[in-house]
A protein has these predicted regions:
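Extreme N-terminus nucleophile/cap motif
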Residues: 2-9, 14-65, 159, 166-190, ...
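Extended, highly charged
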Residues: 59-220, 224-227
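Flexible, small-/acidic-enriched active-site or ligand-binding loops
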Residues: 235
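Conserved small/polar residues in nucleotide/adenosyl-binding loops
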Residues: 238
Length: 239
């Protein structure tokens, strides 16, 4: 099932009514109150998430989750180690995009995003393929697995102004994608934070995203989410 088909499933069907959606998720936060960044914060966040497995739903196969994710501060040093030519902290933003696995459709979405970014007076420095371990997914989860890309963007020298520019660009990318019938979902777009998430169980997040267990991947905070959809349907925007 591709992302467009998944979105179409959210419409009223059978006894399901989108207007009555509720969920019962688990949320946890690990933070260094002094502001210092370390990989320990990320590791502790993963442990908190795993200890909240009872707050997230999963299928009978124990491999299909309602969703799990983590928001972290942008790991500047880790990004430099990936060979991405970003400027100093606060002078660039990172967008996390979920795109179709089909190469042509994915390329079309990236072209659309790059076009909007350029029209907004921003510069797209680089696009990174986020490494994932698809082998841990169930067959059901693998059918809706997106291609996950990180976009590195520069603009105004002032961080607050750049965040505003990124917000506007993100909204325009989303609108243009919807009008074109493209399956392009922005998980995060900011100069400060980035998101790693998916239709995973709480225990799958660290295994699915190798970045999160890299000792050079650091943050001063880790906000985690374990989703229990209750009477909702699964979709990436609510993970």
């Amino acid at each position: 099932m591709d992302m467009n088909q998944n979105r179409q499933r959210q419409a009223k069907q059978g006894l399901y009514r989108p207007a009555y959606e509720h969920d019962a998720c688990g949320v946890g936060l690990v933070v260094n109150v002094g502001g210092g960044k370390s990989h320990e914060i990320v590791e502790n966040g993963l442990q908190v998430l795993e200890h909240m497995a009872h707050r997230g739903a999963e299928g009978a196969d124990s491999k299909t989750g309602d969703g799990a994710g983590m928001m972290v501060q942008i790991p500047h040093e880790f990004i430099l180690l990936q060979g991405i030519p970003v400027p100093e902290k606060g002078k660039y933003g990172v967008g996390v995009l979920f795109l179709p696995k089909d190469q042509a459709a994915c390329a079309a979405c990236l072209d659309l995003a790059a076009s909007v970014i350029g029209r907004e007076g921003l510069d797209l420095l680089a696009v990174r393929d986020v490494p994932v371990n698809s082998e841990i997914l169930s067959d059901e989860a693998r059918c809706s697995e997106p291609a996950i890309k990180q976009l590195f963007i520069t603009g105004s020298e002032d961080q607050a102004a750049l965040d505003t520019e990124l917000y506007i660009a993100g909204k325009k990318i989303g609108r243009a994608a919807r009008e074109a019938g493209m399956a392009c979902y922005i998980a995060s777009l900011s100069t400060r934070t980035m998101v790693y998430k998916g239709l995973l169980t709480s225990h799958q997040l660290r295994c699915y995203f190798p970045d999160l267990v890299n000792p050079y991947f650091t943050s001063g905070m880790a906000l985690v989410h374990s989703r229990f959809s209750t009477n909702t349907l699964d979709r990436k925007s609510v993970v």
